[in-house]
């Protein structure tokens, strides 16, 4: 798993 994917996976907030 790349760091970008990990970062996206760590996003726990909902976009507007």
Curated annotation (Swiss-Prot):
Q: Supply the InterPro entries for this chain.
A: His_leader
Q: Which UniProt keywords apply?
A: Amino-acid biosynthesis, Histidine biosynthesis, Leader peptide
Q: Does the keyword Amino-acid biosynthesis apply?
A: yes
Q: Which residues cross the membrane?
A: none
- For the keyword Amino-acid biosynthesis, the answer is yes
- Pfam families linked to this entry: His_leader
Report the superkingdom from the record: Bacteria
The Gene Ontology biological process annotation of the record reads: L-histidine biosynthetic process
Q: Report the function annotation for this chain.
A: This protein is involved in the attenuation mechanism for the control of the expression of the his operon structural genes.
Say which family it is in. Belongs to the HisL family.
Entry protein name: his operon leader peptide
Organism lineage: Bacteria, Pseudomonadati, Pseudomonadota, Gammaproteobacteria, Enterobacterales
């Amino acid at each position: 798993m790349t760091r970008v994917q990990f970062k996206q996976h760590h996003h726990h907030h909902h976009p507007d």
